[in-house]
UniProtKB/Swiss-Prot annotation:
Record InterPro entries: Resolv_RecU, Restrct_endonuc-II-like, tRNA_endonuc-like_dom_sf
GO molecular function terms listed in the Swiss-Prot or TrEMBL record: endonuclease activity; magnesium ion binding; nucleic acid binding
Keywords: Cytoplasm, DNA damage, DNA recombination, DNA repair, Endonuclease, Hydrolase, Magnesium, Metal-binding, Nuclease
Top-level EC class as recorded in UniProt: hydrolase
EC number(s) stated in the UniProt entry for this protein: 3.1.21.10
A GO biological process held by the record: DNA recombination
Family, per entry: Belongs to the RecU family.
Annotated protein name in UniProt: Holliday junction resolvase RecU
Superkingdom, natural source: Bacteria
Amino acid sequence: MAIGYPGGKKYTASHEGLPSKKRKTPVTYGKRGMSLEDDLNDTIAYYLAHDIAVIHKKPTPVQIVSVDYPKRSSAKIKEAYFKTPSTTDYNGVYKGKYVDFEAKETQNTTSFPLSNFHDHQMTHMANVLKQDGIVFVIIAFQKLGETHFIPFEKFYPFWERMQSGGRKSVTISEIQDVSDQVPYGLNPRLDFLQSIDKLYF
C-alpha cells in the first residue's frame, strides 16, 4: 500500500534519527591507549598493594600565577604553568635500597632522542648513584612493543657522548646491548623489579 501526503505528494521514508550501520573494524585488545606512565602507575600500585615495594610518581611542579577569590571560603586558579621538573619521575624503596628512575617513551623505531632528558635530571641521577642508590631509566619503544630497563651508569655515557658533540640519539641496537628488556604482563603490568633483582641483588 502506497502512503502519500494530502495533495498527492509521495511519502519517502527518512532514515534520520536511526542509528547508522557502521562498518565493523577488528578490535585489538593489546595495550589499548595505555601509555608507559599508565603502565608504570598500575605496576607501582600493584607493588604497594602487595607489600613488594613502595614507589611513587612525583607530582609535576606547577607555578600558580593568578588566583581569583569569588568567595572568602573558596579560591579559583585562573592561570598556572607547569614548571620544568627538577628531578626524576619516580622514587621509592625496595629491599631497603633507595630507587630513583626516569621513564620515557618514543614512537621512533630506530633510535631514542636524548633531547627527552634534561641536564638537571642527569645531574640528579648522577648524585643518586654517588650515594649508592639504584638509579635507572626505562625507555619504551611503543611501535616495537619493547620496554627497556637501563642502569644509569650504562645510559650516562650516551649523554656524555652527545655533550661532547657526538650523536644526539641512542640507536635501538645500542639500547638493546646495555639494557634488560622488561616483560609486559597482566599483574604487574611492567615488572621492572625483575630487572632490579637480576642486576642489583
